[in-house]
Design a protein with these regions (language model features):
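A short glycine-rich, Lys/Arg-flanked "PGG" loop and its adjoining helix->strand segment in the class I
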Residues: 77-89
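Conserved SAM-binding loop of SAM-dependent methyltransferases across substrates and taxa
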Residues: 6-15
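A short acidic, Gly/Pro-enriched loop at the edge of an enzyme's catalytic core
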Residues: 53-62
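Conserved SAM-binding loop
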Residues: 32-33
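Conserved SAM-binding strand-loop segment of SAM-dependent methyltransferases
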Residues: 39-52
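Conserved SAM-binding motif I beta-strand of class I
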Residues: 18-23
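Substrate-binding/catalytic lobe of Class I Rossmann-like enzymes that use SAM or dcSAM, i.e.
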Residues: 99-189
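Conserved beta-strand signature within the Rossmann-like core of class I S-adenosyl-L-methionine
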Residues: 90-98
Length: 189
């Protein structure tokens, strides 16, 4: 999914890219469209409310940022086959995927942890080895990987700080102390 349109805005503004963004969220769709319009980039970016499995056409590049974790392990082959089908010959995909250590994957996938139970129900992190298998099965070439776990820890810390700063506004929307504790735990996880 295109999320809130941040990457689409960056790619359109900085690189002149023509963007097709997809999402299942009406709220994200409205926000992304407004964001792009506000930046004067509407001619470069279009957004659609559609499931990735229903997208047609072919693209020069595909970017997927932390969406894969939400598709569920049973849909991993579908995801990679769709990426392959949507790529023009000779084109590329950049996939930002949160992974779990190879040695922890088998035990992790057998029972839900805190994040799977309370934050991202149905979510499943792949291991690096599991990703390589899925790439191979879809006949996609896995070229490179980059790990930035320490950067993500800083991101979570910044999100926690922002969450606490905005708590009065969040609470005013009807969210209770249990919700606050749950998200603080996640952001310190």
């Amino acid at each position: 999914g295109c999320g809130w349109g941040g990457f689409a805005e960056l790619a359109a503004r900085e690189f002149g890219a023509q963007i097709t963004g997809i999402t299942l969220s009406k709220e994200q769709l409205a926000y992304a469209k407004a964001r792009i319009e506000q930046q004067g980039l509407s001619q470069q970016a279009q957004f659609h409310l559609i499931d990735y499995r229903d997208v047609s056409g072919q693209y020069d590049h595909i970017v997927s940022i932390e969406m894969f974790e939400a598709v569920g392990e049973e849909h991993w082959p579908t995801y990679f086959n769709q990426v392959k089908r949507l790529l023009k010959p000779g084109s590329s995909a950049l996939l930002q995927i949160i992974t779990i250590a190879n040695e922890r994957f088998d035990s992790y996938r057998k029972s839900a942890d805190f994040i799977q139970k309370y934050i991202f129900p149905g979510g499943m992190l792949p291991s690096h080895e599991a990703l390589e298998r899925e790439f191979d099965n879809a006949q996609l070439r896995f070229e490179d990987s980059f790990y930035f776990g320490k950067d993500y820890a800083r991101t979570l810390a910044q999100w926690r700080h922002a969450f606490l700063a905005q708590w009065p506004r969040i609470q005013a929307q009807g969210f209770d102390e249990r919700f606050r504790r749950m998200w603080l735990y996640y952001l310190c996880y």
